[in-house]
Amino acid sequence: MEVWWKRECLRVDETKLFSALHRAHHQSAFRANVSSVVAAQTFEASGDLSKAIAAAILTLGRKHAPLEQTYQFLSMEEPWREVPGMLKRGAKVPGWGGTFQRDKPDPLWQEVDDLLADIWPATYIKISSVTTTLIEHGKTLYPNPSAYTAAVALVLELPKELVSYLFIGARLAAWSMIAQKQLTQEGVG
């Protein structure tokens, strides 16, 4: 598969990972997360899909999808070693914890997790070691979509400054479907 950020095409295993990431993001977008809620509300208020998508994108960052911070964290050789200090300072570990899956790993992201474990063990070890360290320090937190998106960006050699492309590109269809559903509901009401 050709991608715009690399000279060479993605290998078959990389294409599988890219596709799995897209599927997981698409499914995740139908939850009441902040970007999807803002997209729906903006479309309802404006009737303009472009504004709804722009508003959804503007929610990305520090609290919702801290993609660049998570990428930087997972770029460290041993990110799990940073966790105790982060917790001591009261800082959040970017890419861990979530609104929808608090007590166990998110099943929507299992395919991405499995592919990382099977084909990119070094990346998977970083993720699982951070999770283990959090649990050892009394924080039952699991990787969220930001962690998986950043991990895939690292594996596919997408620069940190462009990691949001994976998130946005994978959620565009879902955000559009959310808007279309509102149009259908308005026509009925």
Regions from the PLM with identified roles:
Residues 1-189:
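Non-transmembrane, aqueous-exposed alpha-helical and coiled segments at domain scale
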